[in-house]
Design a protein with these regions (language model features):
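Short, polar/flexible loop-turn hinges at active-site or ligand-entry regions and domain interfaces
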Residues: 56-57, 147-151, 235
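Short, histidine-centered active-site or binding-site loop motifs used for metal coordination
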Residues: 14-16, 47-49, 146-147, 204, ...
């Protein structure tokens, strides 16, 4: 009998920069839980990446623990898979240096996210922001991940990770797996409720533009009521001419499993008020059990820390093996342990 085919490995990370939004939930975290049955998963709280923006130390610590608790609450299984904090696995930064020495200045200069962010915050264009894609490449390559769930804004970073891996393999012999992007089938991108042509973001100054995973039902209803739609009063999917309504349909579809045609039929002849309330109801109902579980897990600080300690140990075993191999290949002297 043939051995069971080796499961592919997935690595994904999320920064602990505030509570995840409904967009993060639908686009990423919810899928993380669903991927567990088919893949070996490593899920990372990317705290080192957060340092490209100056953080309040106590807040960063608290949010790191909160994010870990939230990931456990959505159903990440820390026994079957690996949940860890990036800074707890020092090998990431060790590999990042070697990779940086195999990355061209020009390649990093061309990264659109670097150009966008440095234009937006010209007062803080730090070296970390510039070499961010190298650390991200290290995060992925250190585990020889086969697949990386990425949003549109990160595809370029995945490309450079593949380029760096391919170049390193070419010079030093086969070392790294070339990772591929994994784009989930449904609802990958949830837009702002206030400006439905741009992505929902927790850094938005208008608090009505996003829904946080921890928002209570009243807040959810209030924010959906204020969501921007259009004046034609028909629930119909069309991203170009009806971005607001289409975004709400996307959210409704995610939680009900209904197709756009079914949703259009359900609300035929009804106003947007009814539709918005229905979207708010299904969203609040979907988030309620996650919120209850989150509160329960967060209250058990020792458990969260135990999970993270265990995750760091398991991640480090894989990561250290890669770094050791890379150090040997590039000629760094290693002494017998």
């Amino acid at each position: 009998i043939m051995a069971e085919e080796k499961r592919k490995r997935i690595l994904s990370g999320i920064q602990p920069t505030g509570t995840p939004t409904l967009g993060n939930y639908i686009g990423a975290v919810r899928n993380w839980a669903l991927l567990q049955s088919d893949y070996d998963c490593l899920y990372m709280v990317a705290d080192l990446h957060s340092l490209t923006v100056r953080q309040v130390p106590a807040d960063l610590r608290r949010r790191t623990r909160e994010l870990a608790a939230l990931l456990l609450a959505v159903g990440i299984d820390p026994k079957e898979h690996v949940l860890f904090v990036q800074s707890h696995v020092p090998a990431h930064t060790e590999l990042a240096w070697v990779l940086a020495c195999n990355t061209q200045f020009g390649e990093l200069s061309r990264m659109t996210q670097f150009k966008d962010k440095s234009a937006k915050h010209p007062d803080n264009v730090n070296g970390g922001l510039f070499t961010y894609p190298v650390l991200m490449a290290a995060d992925i390559l250190i585990y020889n991940a086969d697949l990386v769930p990425v949003g549109q804004d990160q595809t370029q970073h995945l490309e450079i990770a593949r380029d760096i891996a391919g170049r390193f393999n070419g010079i030093y012999g086969d070392t790294f797996t070339l990772p591929e992007g994994y784009v989930p089938a449904a609802g990958a991108k949830i837009m702002s409720l206030a400006e439905p042509t741009k992505k929902m973001s927790k850094s938005d100054t208008n608090i009505n533009s996003f829904i946080l995973m921890t928002d209570d039902k009243d807040a959810i209803v209030r924010k959906f009521k204020r969501a921007v739609t259009d004046s034609d009063g028909v629930v119909r999917f069309d991203r170009e001419t009806k971005p607001g309504v289409s975004n709400l349909m996307c959210i409704y579809s995610t939680f009900t499993g209904k197709s756009n045609d079914e949703i259009a039929a359900e609300f035929e002849g009804k106003g947007y008020g009814d539709f918005k309330l229905a979207v708010a109801e299904v969203t609040a109902d979907a988030l309620a059990p996650v919120q209850a579980e989150y509160a329960r897990i967060l209250a058990d600080r020792a458990y969260v820390d135990e999970v993270l300690k265990n995750g760091a140990e398991r991640a480090s075993r894989l990561a250290n093996r890669t770094v050791s191999k890379v150090y040997r290949k590039v000629g760094l002297l290693q002494l017998d342990k």
